[in-house]
């Protein structure tokens, strides 16, 4: 008799456990299928790595080319408010950020390579800079449904560098070695000296993202947003450029909602 009661008790426990598991699975299934939108999107970016304001060392920007920067993203938006007005969006984005600039500078702190040796000092003349960095980015955004057609969104993004270029050259000028009154090294008659700070690009970036999207129909949408990097794109202890540079980009794209 005791054995029968024991078996019945075990059966009841197993049944209750199975029901609890089914409830958990159903709950998880409902979470990922109810009040949630999945989307993929592509974007084109215009901008660059820029200081905040014009440093006194940069006297003139002679040319600026943002190049062709492209991004792809997959994201999910979970609508959490009872009337579906507010949501939280989490995504994964592959994106490029780059630019080319030509500037005329004065007493611009830099480090160049001359005769296979690094020379640090204050440069006056022309500087060309090439930046091309690739990131994996995770945006974490709040979304507000303004109407059936319009959504507004904003929040933070966190980026991990996966490929990096930050280089260029100086020409048509001179460099004062170590100090603004140090030994003069001239670069004239087409003479150039290269620099390469690619290894000094910061591996982690974070910033803010603000934008809007317009639904063309049930599946397709157009979007635009602005991203601003809070931290310098170069490492904290890097001192061959004496001002901070931030990623500032305007992004325009389109998306498909499933």
What is the predicted function of each stretch?
Residues 1-35:
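Cleavable N-terminal export/targeting peptides
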Residues 30-46:
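Transmembrane beta-strand segments of Gram-negative outer membrane beta-barrel proteins
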Residues 33, 77-83, 147, 217-219:
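Outer-membrane beta-barrel channels and translocator barrels
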Residues 42-44, 70-78, 92-94, 138-144, ...:
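Residues on the lipid-exposed face of transmembrane beta-strands in outer-membrane beta-barrel proteins
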Residues 48-67, 97-134, 161-203, 231-249:
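Extracellular/periplasm-exposed beta-strand and loop segments of Gram-negative cell-envelope proteins
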Residues 67-71, 85-87, 133-137, 147:
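Short connector loops at helix/strand junctions that flank enzyme active sites
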Residues 84-88, 149-152, 218-224:
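Repeated loop/turn-to-beta-strand initiation elements of outer-membrane beta-barrel proteins
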Residues 87-98:
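Early exported N-terminus immediately downstream of N-terminal targeting peptides
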């Amino acid at each position: 008799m005791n054995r029968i009661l024991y078996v019945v008790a075990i059966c009841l426990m197993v049944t209750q456990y199975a029901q609890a598991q089914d409830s958990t699975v159903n709950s998880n299934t409902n979470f990922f299928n109810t009040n949630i939108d999945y989307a993929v999107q592509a974007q084109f970016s215009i901008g660059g790595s820029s200081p905040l304001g014009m440093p006194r060392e940069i006297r003139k920007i002679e040319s600026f080319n943002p190049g062709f920067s492209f991004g792809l993203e997959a994201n999910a938006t979970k609508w959490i408010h009872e009337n579906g007005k507010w949501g939280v969006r989490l995504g994964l984005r592959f994106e490029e950020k780059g630019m080319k600039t030509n500037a005329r500078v004065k007493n611009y702190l830099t480090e160049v390579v001359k005769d296979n040796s690094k020379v640090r000092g204050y440069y006056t003349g022309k500087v060309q800079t090439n930046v091309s960095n690739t990131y994996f980015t995770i945006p974490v955004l709040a979304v507000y449904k303004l109407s059936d057609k319009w959504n507004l969104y904003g929040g933070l993004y966190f980026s991990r560098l996966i490929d990096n270029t930050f280089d260029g050259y100086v020409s048509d000028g001179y460099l004062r070695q170590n100090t603004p009154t140090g030994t003069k090294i001239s670069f004239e008659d087409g003479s150039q000296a290269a620099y390469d700070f690619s290894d000094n690009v910061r591996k982690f970036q974070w910033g803010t993202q603000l934008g809007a999207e317009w639904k063309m129909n049930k599946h397709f949408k157009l979007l635009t947003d602005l991203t601003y990097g809070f931290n310098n794109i170069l490492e904290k202890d890097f001192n061959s450029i004496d001002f901070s540079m931030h990623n500032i980009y305007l992004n325009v794209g389109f998306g498909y909602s499933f």
